[in-house]
Structure formats: C-alpha cells, structure tokens
C-alpha cells in the first residue's frame, strides 16, 4: 500500500465499512488491514493481530484505505510534517507475553497477511531492539526482519550501521555486513567486516576496530581478528589484538580483555615507560584481575634493559571481619649486582571477637641499595627503615589493651633502632567522671637493639611505667580553665653490658606534674574589613595562659629507648613535657602566654585570617636535657613564636611562621608557604624553610627554598614543574619537569625527575605514560610522583568531543 500524506490541517474522513473493500486477487479482511493502517498512524502492529490467508491487497485501493483510517489526535506540526501519536498509551507487556512490534515508513505493503514491507524511512521497534533501513521486510510468523540500504540496528545501548542487516527481532539474533558501530556507555566506535548478534547481550565482530576517539580523528584504535562483546558481563575480549597509536602499532596480544563500562573489570592498565641512569629503559605493563567483588590482583611485569625482568604483584582482599593487602616484587639475577633482588609488604587486620582484633604489618627488602635502585619516588628511595610488627588490641568501654612485637629492618648508612620484644600497654580513659577527665596508662616493654655496623652493643633492657592523669575542665561561654595533674612512675631493669660490667642496671623515677591551661575569647564585628572586602566579618581576640610545674629528677643515667627532643613550636610550647616518649620528664616552672586573632566570615564561618604570637618564660631554668643534666640552668624567656595564615582572596593562600630569639637577635627558624590557585589546574607554590643549627637539631642547619606549579601552555597542554635548592650546600635537592597533553581520547604524560640520593649522588629518571580513554583509565606512577611533589596538582583528563541528546538517539 502507498501512504498518502495529509496536510496538518486536513481531517480524516469518516471511515466506511471495511468489509466492502476488495483486491485483484481476493478479499482482505478488516482484521488484517487494521494493524497495517494503524501502524502508519503510529499505532502498534501487535503479535496478536490475526491475518487470514488472503492475497496482497489491490494497489488501486490504497487511497481509500488511507482515507478510512480511524481519526487520531494530531500532535503540533513540526516544519509542516505530521508527527504520528498513539491515540492511547501503549499497553505494558505482561510477564510471559511477547512484546508488540511497532512499524512505520513512507510506504507500507502487506503480504501473506502476516508480513509487511516498508520503504522509505522504514523502522521496526520491538522490545528493546530497533531496526531501520531504506527498505525493511518483516515477517510476524518468523519474527525475521531484513533491512536493506542504510541499515541501522540498535540494542542494549549499542548501535550498528551498515548496508544490510537480518534480525530475529525478539530473540536479538542476526547479522550485519560491513558495520560501523557505537557503544553508548563508553562512547567507543569502530568498523568491522561483519557483526553477528548472538542474543540480547552477546555479539561477535569479525575484523574489527575499536576506539573512543571521534571517527574523523582516531589518534588511537584497537584492531582485532575477532571481538567478543558481552554487555551483561560488561566486558569485551579481543583475539589477535593490536593497539595502534597514530597508525603505528605499539602493543599486541593474542588475547586481550577490556571493560565496556566504567565498572571495575579485568584487563591491562596504563603502560608505564621510563628511563633511569642505572636501570636503562624501564617498561611496566600492569594487568588487573577482578577476582571477586571483595578481592583483586594487579600484576606488574617490568622490563629494565640494564637489569632484567622484574615481576611485581598487589593483592587486596576484604571480608567479614578481616581485610588485607600483599605487595611483592622479585628481580631474579640483577645484571648490575649479580644477585636476586626482592621486596614485600603485607598488612592484615582480623576481628577475633567483639572488641578483640589482631593485625600484622610486615615489610622487608633484599638489600641496602634496593630503595635507591628499584623504587620510583623520592620518598621510597630515601626510606631507610622497614617495620615488621604484629599485635593484638582489645577495646571494652573505656579500656584499651595492646600487645605487640615490633622490629625493624634498618638500611645502611642509618643506625639501628630499638625494637619492642614485646610491648604490653593498657589505657583507661574516662571523660566527665563527676566533672573530671581521667586517664591511666600502664606499659611494659622489653627493648632490644641490633649491633651497630661497627659491632657496638647499645644498652638494652626492660621499662615499666604507670602514668595516671586527672584534669578538671571548666568551660564557660567566652572562657575556659583546665587544671591537670600527671604522675609518672617508671622502673628500668637493664641488661649487663660487656663494655661496662660495673654499670648500674636498675633505675627508677617518680615525677609529679601540675599544669593549668586557661583562655578567653572576645568577639566583635569588623566593619572596616567588611567595607573593604564587601563581606561581613567577625574578629576574635583569644588570649591564652599555660603554666606547668614539674620538680627536678636526675635522669642522666637513664637510657633513651624511644625519646627525642620535640621541635620547638606551638605544640611543644603549650605542653607539659618538651620530650616525646617516656624516658625523659623535664623539670618545669614555666609560664606560656599566647594571643590569637582571627577574621571569620559571619555568614559562612570560613576563617580568612589567623595570626598568633606566643612566648614562654622559664622561672628557674630546665636542668633535664636529652643527653644529660645541665648543671647551672638560667631563668629566662624562650624564643618568640609568631605565625599567620591568610586566605582573604579567592585562590590565594599564605602560611608563614617565625621563631625569633630576642637576646641574640637571631631568627632560629622560619617558614613561608605561598600558593596561588586561580582556576583548576592553574597553580603556583612557593616555599622557604630556614633553621639555624643548634644542639637540639644536632647541628643540622636548613636553608632551602622550593617552587612548584602546574599551568596550561595551550588549551590541551599543561606544564608541571618543581625545583628545590639547598643554599647551605649550594646544590639542588631535587627537580622535576613534566608535560601533560589531553586529547579528546587520550592523555600523554612525560616527566623527568632528578634528586639527591642517600649516597650523596644524584638519580635521574624519565617517565612516559599514555592513557587511552575507555581502554585504560587507571593512572600509574607519574601521577603519584606529581601529587607528592606538586601540592594541589590535578591530573588532566581526556576531553572528548561534546555530544548532544540527538546524537545516536536510538
């Protein structure tokens, strides 16, 4: 039949009785004509429509058939076209029922009472499948559709376009020749020799390509002898696959799997390319195994041309009451050292019962040079200590108990550290017990230490202490006061040493401490600042007084198991003890005064400015020192501390601090950190750090500055850099330069890093990474290096060509 288009303003004639129609070959019953006529008006041709065995209707009757179509409401015209609409909402398919079919076209012809031929903008929809073409033949008995000319098949979020296609529509079975295809979930496209539709989820593509680039600018594509796609499992498998980058093959694999969505899937991750002065060309191609929702494994095959083949693995797991991670690397027969190189790291936590937990943290490397030779970051390469620890913790109400063994692997040239074999620790913490805060800590530890590199044995022994603390916080609007009492009782049992056989082996100490912390907060409007910045500001003034008293106890013969001098700063100046650990308790008769002022946005509560100044006065002088006793201490004031943090302007951040000695008129410590971040991926960081050499810092002076940043060079290219310089040594500490380029479907990164290593030499490395959007999305080591070295760094991402809701609208 031939459809005659109606003007939008022309109404359908009243339909006569259909039984009077005839054809050249026989009568076509109304039950057969009705679905075909209604289909042209936008109604469904349901599978339940009953056609008799009459012949094809008479072509001469076409006009009368169209004119007798039932009247249906017309949608508003669009550019003069009639837009068909359903007179009633389509009925929902019940479970077990076959879904109805919907057909439309410029010309529609029925045959064999159960078939239909559509020509011109032909379209068939059934269930979730859509078949289109210049000409489309559909047989309801076999549910077969054949599209010829500009055939389009849409199903399961995928669209295929080719010269012809044949489909069993409800079963989603069929094929298409020479298709172009598009995947909605990933934005990927490709071409093929043939595509076979197995069912609604699976398809097989022969001689296929795949890319997430725009079809007109495919910088990279993946070609394969065969692609097996499974939308239910959301994974694709390629056989005989080759990855092309700017038409150059760069990688291949006999079998290759890749995700069809952003969900976690097994497959290759971003390859990592690098070059090291000692390792040569360095290539890593990680492979990710999605074993289960709660377990995964990543293998890191790594080839270093100057050393050999290295294999690394990272296994993670989590379950009901337990979790853990195992990382390991092995390099058999390193060509540089003629030895096997390896490392491992294992962490595990286990819930044994309610409140009872066990843990393991084991880390080790094969030799002292492993971090310098085989790690990829400055932090890893300078690590000289690896912990091995296992323990059990128990928590019940206000009680906490810890039992652990802690050992270390210390690499040369660093000296060994004390190990806990074992430690038993218990704490009781109770807040607001009749207004009091109560804490009691008891500890037993046996300290052991390996021989030094020269064979010297340092002191070893056992330490037991009990330290109860009680405070009474008084907090009122605008002010607070907290008196506190601490009592420390410590007992040492030392092991005899061959080099000092007559030395005393038993020590004990009981030391009380009293402190009183108090402060006030005054608040007012800041009209001047409000006028300048156009924002309502509040200003605070917060004075603070802190007094501490501890009597002197001679501790010059006590060992130093876990105690060091705290760096002088705000944390130390308002504390009861200037030492960390429990081997030293300083004698105190000190008063600290501090003053803080803040500017706060009244509407948002954001702190835009904070300035603090503080100083401590020692009334009697401190005799207890980290390495002995000062015989004649003098009273006096400490260094003056001042610090400020400023964020008054959007995108600007300033943090500065200074430690000034009024007596010597020297600056003993200062730091400055400035950051400018006007937009995402636009940042500039400037830092400076200075420390004068003192006995507390082991005569180690610091005078360093650094600058780092990230900035767009073009719309798609970004530069990243860092430079740190030591003025005392008059040499570079470390430097980094990198370039990132974001295309529509890939991101390229090249990073060069040079840093001073532990042997006073320099290590230089180059990293190169290409990340293909939709094929490999997990970043690798260059991202970690950039995040560690450039504060605020944001990795660039691919910038796909924008699409609209009208693209691939099927």
Curated annotation (Swiss-Prot):
GO cellular component, as recorded: cell outer membrane; transporter complex
Pfam entry (one): LptD
The organism's place on the tree of life at top rank: Bacteria
Signal peptide segment: 1-49
InterPro entries the record matches: LipoPS_assembly_LptD (IPR020889), LptD (IPR050218), LptD_C (IPR007543)
Family: Belongs to the LptD family.
Known partners and oligomeric status: Component of the lipopolysaccharide transport and assembly complex. Interacts with LptE and LptA.
Protein name: LPS-assembly protein LptD
Keyword line: Cell outer membrane, Membrane, Signal
Region (Disordered): 1-26, 54-79
Species, as recorded: Cupriavidus pinatubonensis (strain JMP 134 / LMG 1197)
PANTHER family: LPS-ASSEMBLY PROTEIN, LPS-ASSEMBLY PROTEIN LPTD
Function: Together with LptE, is involved in the assembly of lipopolysaccharide (LPS) at the surface of the outer membrane.
Compartment annotation: Cell outer membrane
One of the GO BP terms on file: Gram-negative-bacterium-type cell outer membrane assembly
